[in-house]
Amino acid sequence: MEIRVMKAEDYDKLYELLMTIKGFGIRSIDDSREGVARFLKRNPTTSMTAWDGDTLIGAILCGHDGRRGCLYHVCVRKGYRRHGVGKAMVVACMEALRKEEINKVTLIAFTKNDIGNAFWNKIGWTEREDLNYYDFTLNEANITAFIEED
């Protein structure tokens, strides 16, 4: 397995991987080729990919605003889970954030994502129960489509 920084050229394999993750939400604008390229241009060193030869087996979009980092779309291809791929990518993202003097990183996990929530707890992340999460949609055209569950 090789962990490396995500590049815009990885998009086709990234999209194919995301489409295999059941229950995953893909946004029509943010997760388009242009949306991912825009994110990577703003955060050129912090998003990671995991490879087994030419096969993309994991990916994390990771960025920051100068104060706090955030992980988006953390995923590992089925069949490669529970082999350290996710943890290796998370560690690489956190190291990249530290180099940019970011001191804290957050993520959002759906409450129904039992596998993901178990993973974050296992690797030492803290679930916050002292705050509420709010969002506001600025572009109604940025539609989220969820990958069908089996």
Description of each model-found segment:
Residues 1-14:
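A short beta-loop-alpha structural element at the N-terminal edge
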Residues 37-49, 70:
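A short helix-loop-beta-strand connector motif used in the catalytic cores of GNAT acetyltransferases and
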Residues 49, 55-63, 70-75:
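Conserved beta-strand in the GNAT
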Residues 63-72, 81, 128-131:
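A conserved beta-turn-beta hairpin within the catalytic core of GNAT-like acetyltransferases
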Residues 74-81, 109-110:
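A short, internal acetyl-CoA/4′-phosphopantetheine-binding micro-motif in the GNAT/acyltransferase core
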Residues 82-95, 122:
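Conserved acetyl-CoA-binding loop-helix of GNAT-fold acetyltransferases
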Residues 87-88, 111-130:
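Conserved active-site alpha-helix within GNAT-family acetyltransferase domains
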Residues 97-109:
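Conserved GNAT acetyl-CoA-binding A-motif
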